[in-house]
Amino acid sequence: MGKNQPLPILITGGGRRIGLAIAWHFLNQKQPVIVSYRTHYPAIDGLTQAGALCIQADFSTDDGVLAFAEKIKTHTPGLRAILHNASAWMAEAPGTPLSDVLACMMQIHVNTPYLLNHALERLLRGHGHAATDIIHFTDYVVERGSDKHIAYAASKAALDNMTRSFARKLAPEVKVNAIAPSLILFNENDDAEYRQQALNKSLMKTAPGEKEVIDLVDYLLTSCFVTGRSFAVDGGRHLR
């Protein structure tokens, strides 16, 4: 890495949807990007060709998380930011042990960012006042709860709480914030009836797309003062 080259931004779960859009946003700005991915989608090849460093990671175990952190250290002496976007969505369902559901959700949404923030702390420090960032991607359900995804909601709530704890620990060098989205974009196979029902849950009645999140990420990275806060991107859904 050249002396004048910007420090890379690490995006976990950057192979699809919002993580992928954020990765492309930074690549288009000539900002170096490191992307973790679990499953090799065709989009990973596109990111690699555009200059991103894409690393397959297994966050299902603590050992896998720590092994990924060690790989990061071999590629860069510092990081501009860590965006914790890797996520899984698992409901309590008949036939699936509840302890497995809870363990899975806590592993990806709590253990993984907790261990990575500690393991990569040295790469975030030493660059100046408010010079680097951690952004946790949580969820709208942190505020409301969910009767069908109880473990998921609980794990995202824990991640939300860690935002404030890490903000206290890492200030003033590192800013730590959270983004709590609800519906941002649909899946290709979502039918018209589902889409309309989902849109009606917010005051704004629209799926804004990735740019709404990207603009917020840009704001948080450029701010020299904001830390320890969670930013809802929910179209007023909490008022319905």
Curated annotation (Swiss-Prot):
Pfam families: adh_short_C2. GO terms for molecular function: dihydrofolate reductase activity. Coiled coil: none annotated. It comes from Citrobacter koseri (strain ATCC BAA-895 / CDC 4225-83 / SGSC4696). Transmembrane segments: none annotated. Keywords: NADP, One-carbon metabolism, Oxidoreductase. Gene3D superfamilies: NAD(P)-binding Rossmann-like Domain. Catalyzes the reduction of dihydromonapterin to tetrahydromonapterin. Also has lower activity with dihydrofolate. Its EC number is 1.5.1.50, 1.5.1.3. The lineage of its organism: Bacteria, Pseudomonadati, Pseudomonadota, Gammaproteobacteria, Enterobacterales. InterPro entries: NAD(P)-bd_dom_sf, Sc_DH/Rdtase_CS, SDR_fam. One of its GO terms (biological process) is one-carbon metabolic process. The active site is at 152 (proton acceptor). It catalyses: (6S)-5,6,7,8-tetrahydrofolate + NADP(+) = 7,8-dihydrofolate + NADPH + H(+); 7,8-dihydromonapterin + NADPH + H(+) = 5,6,7,8-tetrahydromonapterin + NADP(+). This is Dihydromonapterin reductase. Belongs to the short-chain dehydrogenases/reductases (SDR) family. FolM subfamily. It is an enzyme of class 1 (oxidoreductase).
